């Protein structure tokens, strides 16, 4: 629907409904211009503003009232190569020789482009801040693999604290950073203390088991020391007859062990 404006009729130009009136001093923000009182005073009946099919009618009516291009500071889509589109994208064009909206898409599509990333062009300035991807938080949670967790748990059972060289060695073995290993041990110690406070009886059992393990390890060390001393006594050529008698008594008849004994007549191979 088009109408002939008094000032534009003298020039013989046809202006569409949504085109601003090319006044000498345009005042689109005045109440008289918004309500169309100027057109009523000039004898032309004021036409009602058509409703636009948009989810936000107030916003679309505001767009129709201001009559300014939405993507004024942003690049225009290549499809908008029409001379009228270039005129609409300029800042404050003085003449309106061509329609402002020569496109097939309704104005509601442009209003939707303010909310979502539309193919018409870039959204307004606040939209990229809303739609920007969330970056990974520095120092975020690190997920360890099952093998890494098992090795870390084994190391924690034997040693609650790690020295810097041990931490470096363990991190290199598990292909982790020293900071990750240090953080894991700190969290594991905190969990261990919390469980210790919640269940003191279970901690006593753990302490007794650890003491038993220490005793077993010490016994094994003592036995290995005795065995080494016996082997050294067997290898000694100046062993006493009492040691040889003890050796004969220690070796049972069912044993297949072969022992070399040095006597007055040389070495004999005694198979029992």
UniProtKB/Swiss-Prot annotation:
Keywords: Developmental protein, DNA-binding, Homeobox, Nucleus, Repressor, Transcription, Transcription regulation, Wnt signaling pathway
PROSITE patterns: HOMEOBOX_1, HOMEOBOX_2
Stretches the record annotates as Disordered: 222-272
Record feature DNA-binding region, as residue ranges: 137-196
Acidic residues bias: start-end ranges: 250-261
GO biological process, alphabetically ordered: anterior/posterior pattern specification; cell differentiation; embryonic hemopoiesis; heart development; liver development; negative regulation of DNA-templated transcription; negative regulation of transcription by RNA polymerase II; positive regulation of Wnt signaling pathway
GO terms for MF: DNA-binding transcription factor activity, RNA polymerase II-specific; RNA polymerase II cis-regulatory region sequence-specific DNA binding; sequence-specific DNA binding
Inducing factors: By maternal wnt-beta-catenin signaling and tgf-beta signaling.
Gene3D superfamilies, per the entry: Homeodomain-like
Segments crossing the lipid bilayer: none
Pfam families xrefs: Homeodomain (PF00046)
One GO location term (cellular component): nucleus
CDD domains, per database record: homeodomain
Localization in the cell: Nucleus
SUPFAM superfamilies the record matches: Homeodomain-like (SSF46689)
Function noted in UniProt: Recognizes the DNA sequence 5'-ATTAA-3'. Transcriptional repressor. Regulates the differentiation of both endothelial and blood cells. Probably plays a role in the proliferation of vascular endothelial cells during blood vessel development. Establishes anterior identity at two levels; acts early to enhance canonical wnt-signaling by repressing expression of tle4, and acts later to inhibit nodal-signaling by directly targeting nodal/nr1 and nodal2/nr2. May play a role in liver development. Induces heart development.
Protein name: Hematopoietically-expressed homeobox protein hhex
Organism the protein comes from: Xenopus laevis
Organism classification: Eukaryota, Metazoa, Chordata, Craniata, Vertebrata
